[in-house]
Amino acid sequence: MSIKSLLTTVEPEDLQDVKNFCKVDGDLEDQEITGMMLSARRDIIGQVGDRIDDFFDDNWNFKYAVWLKTYHSYNNRDTSSNAMTFEIQDTYNSTINAMKDDYRYRVWLNDKAKNYDGEERNED
């Protein structure tokens, strides 16, 4: 799925996966959860990068980060509450950092392949 598609549409199976993760039954809040998923995707892609269109396809870390961000947004959506709210888990940040590392490596490989002219290059 292209990055453009990830930022504009949510497939029914992706919505169901998030609802299962958030332990949400029924379809009463599907529109809100879909919006939270799109927002999570935009945030994650913005942090990681958008030069490699297929990077997020079948990427478990991306899927898991979307689940975590959506779960956090869903459970902390009432901003007028006196109840204690929590920051997003370290697991989310670790997952984002792992994706950033993978992404930078893929960009480096792609750039190296484009610039390869048969001679050794100094990568420093």
Predicted features along the sequence, with ranges:
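Divalent metal-cofactor coordination and adjacent catalytic microenvironments
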Residues: 1-124
